[in-house]
Amino acid sequence: MNDTDFSGLSRPLQPMPQFVKDALLERGLFDAYRGRPAYQQNDYLSWINRAKRPQTKEKRLQQMLDELVRGDLYMKMDYTPPSNRA
């Protein structure tokens, strides 16, 4: 179940390609992805979807997966989940 509110996004809502969903599920990262703010979820998908070459899509997907595993990065920038903020 996803109760993320996407209504406040200023950019169009991006569809999740099946290969992204499959990768998230295979690695057990779907919940980590859904735990990110709506803008991050949407930005990741937009960034991956904009890639022209399959190799670039795969590279971007891997970066997203690596950042979700770490939990403290978003697009190579520091990220502190709300549950860890003081």
Indicate residue ranges for each PLM-predicted region:
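Charge-dense, helix-prone N-terminal extensions
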Residues: M1-A86
